[in-house]
């Protein structure tokens, strides 16, 4: 009997030692799969750019909204195209019957966007072309850097920045390896600015308002990192605080108030972010 208790105690001790390591390995596997998804999206985006003289999608209005409507319908369809989902975030905030979850978290997908759930338009006509949403709608857990959308030259992005701040010619982008394209996010597009703060709550789903754009992308799905593709078509891990060092738009201040160079202090960060690397 004593020997059995000793064996049980040893097994319990080994499990206590091994479980954190196994959890870390599982998380690493999820991020590898996440990065693989973004590589697949690189092919989609690069093919579109090559077919459109270096221009990215325009979106379906002058602000660049609704760009996924311009994808091929099979690329739109989350039931066909599984690369819409980070492995850590697959459950949509709206189900197919149009019922919203009671509690929303960063591990939720942002869908399902379609007429019967969120009231998303079934089709949109812009600049003489009509774009149609697939019957299953949109659903995913990645989002696009809105400053790479080809809005009109005289237009402005969400938040008020003029179109000249964006990247209109994808063949001539300075420091393309620092310009994010597609990454873990709480919406399918966003327009971060250097002075925007992260969310106060680690697991908080994003709120409405242009001031929350950086909070839509600074989300802890990968142990202090996120996954991002870039305009040189590389894909890599990005530290959460490193997001403020990326060149989101042409004049984005990479030494802004949320960087070490800009004077940020540990106490300025929400408590959940303080343990992660500074940049």
Name these PLM-found stretches.
Residues 1-26:
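N-terminal single-pass transmembrane signal-anchor helix
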Residues 17, 26-37:
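Juxtamembrane interface helices immediately C-terminal to a transmembrane segment
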Residues 32-279:
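Short, well-structured segments within or immediately adjacent to enzyme catalytic domains
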